[in-house]
């Protein structure tokens, strides 16, 4: 679709069958046709090292360019030790460098956190938001999305098994679409 909004989806868990990946697929499935959500892998990004800025690895360059081309970013993250996974923090660092050339700058974004537990990865959600604000990414404030019991509300194919969670996420994605339009003008 020529008029679609290009959304880079960043799944913070590297496991192929992660609950975060399932949730990201489910979110994409309930988004309007105007949102084209592309899950961009982060597992192949070498750890950020400033010494590499003068001759960056090809995966860094490809990742940065993909983020730059996007209209918006959707982050879906679990919680590791009350924060975001290291792979996500590394992807954020890779995309933000070299200094003054951040691929993230000005990109509207939304954060969804999830866990099998009841708190829905609250700590990861807020640590991630703190980084995104610093990177000048307008983060959608409402609705907030903390999906607890995620293992019970999404199936292995990335579909919702709980109708109320599906409806909440449909509304979340609709709000995200409006947020993108608001920020991008």
Predicted feature descriptions by range:
Residues 12, 42, 114-115:
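Cofactor-binding loop segments of dinucleotide-utilizing enzymes, especially the Rossmann-like FAD-
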